[in-house]
């Protein structure tokens, strides 16, 4: 509620009531912009791992021969909701900068997921068609994309989504004639991505031996020179150790010493702005790091009052416990 163009912005994922709600805070700053992320539109609590199964995604995730739902590790709805909250905050601030005042904005996590399903066509798909979309393992839904195990035991993902990608795969693997024969046998054109999806098992049967007979280094350079869309399966540790895009060669990354934890690579914003130089990532504030500064500069407490708060155990300075993992 402080004055100025760079203040009066409040983003929270708590169902705030009383002194922290919009009605109360806006009495101190009428043009306050407040964005609240809730669980669902009814006010019930939700998290990514409850929204995801409720909307059917686990039933289309995992091995094709399994009926068990699979809750994937990526918190997709949290990530999308976070970006939507920022977009909403900036949109409301833009509204305010045009002289139209502040406002309260509410976004529900489940609504974010439901809207995304609609945007992806999944709601229309099950409404207009008779079959649910099932599991397809690592296959790219709707076109062609498949993982293959190579002679050195390494696994790669190869994509034939567009016509150019598809023709590139066939040429690089020397399977043009075999794919043409498959088209003639099935009486279809594999230039159509829907047919590549429909007959993906037949296509994979042709390509699988080619990869099984070769190590990744045998075709890596040729695939890259041909502009194919492919990658290798790696663990997070392997990616951090081997992929230059996760190293400081990539300008979004810099080495940061995080107090109480250690030194590791941290990304800044992935966007590059032409009108501003990139700012490297900085250590995250530690709990209690700015306690005295806030009490003094924001709350207006005297040094004596601050000392009394510390002595009473109401506030404290940073303390570093044993490092823990991300969970």
Which role does the model predict for each range below?
Residues 259-308:
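Flexible, small-/acidic-enriched active-site or ligand-binding loops
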Residues 132-140, 146-147, 198, 261-264, ...:
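Short Gly/Pro-enriched turn/cap motifs at secondary-structure boundaries
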Residues 304-327:
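Amphipathic terminal alpha-helices
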Residues 224-247:
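Conserved PLP cofactor-binding pocket of PLP-dependent enzymes
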Residues 48, 124-133, 173, 181-183, ...:
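Short, surface-exposed loop/helix-turn segments at secondary-structure junctions
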Residues 5-6, 14-161, 168:
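Active-site-adjacent "lid/gating" segments in soluble enzymes
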Residues 1-3:
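Short amphipathic alpha-helix with an adjacent loop that forms part of the alpha/beta core around
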